[in-house]
């Protein structure tokens, strides 16, 4: 008969509550907190199947092997929260593999597509993340200074 694996999380959570007991009046503990109500879904994932091939179209020049695209429809806009959500998708996509480092982080790009220039989001990236935003051509902006190459397409 196969043994059930020992559940260590409840013991760890109890130990944390004991350790922080003097602060219990203003701490809230949420065990196994769900990050989303809906399934995580990347709007579009473009995988380059042939290494070393370069896309000449301006929209795909930044592409590496795994390219995560976030699209905002005509009545929506790219927000600061969208930036963090898509970065989270990229990191989760990288980590959700069978073997460690199966998807190298340097093989991932992010493209954020919107009808309008995301002024507030890009200001946040410049000021908080110290990224640089460079207009590559009409409607295509590269964000540099991040671990993952990012382009904004408007």
Labelled PLM ranges:
Residues 1-154:
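Conserved single-residue anchors adjacent to enzymatic active/cofactor-binding motifs
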């Amino acid at each position: 008969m196969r043994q059930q694996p020992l559940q260590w999380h409840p013991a760890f959570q109890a130990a944390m509550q004991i350790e922080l007991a003097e602060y219990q009046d203003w701490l809230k503990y949420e065990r196994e907190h769900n990050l989303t109500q809906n399934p995580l879904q990347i709007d579009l994932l473009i995988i380059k199947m042939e290494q070393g091939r370069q896309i000449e179209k301006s929209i795909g020049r930044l592409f590496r092997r795994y390219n995560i695209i976030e699209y905002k429809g005509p009545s929506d806009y790219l927000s600061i929260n969208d930036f963090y959500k898509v970065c989270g998708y990229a990191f989760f996509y990288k980590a959700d593999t069978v073997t460690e480092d199966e998807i190298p982080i340097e093989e991932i790009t992010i493209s954020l597509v919107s009808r309008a220039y995301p002024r507030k989001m890009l200001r946040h990236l410049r000021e908080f993340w110290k990224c640089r935003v460079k207009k590559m051509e009409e409607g295509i902006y590269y964000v540099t200074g991040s671990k993952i190459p990012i382009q904004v397409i408007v």
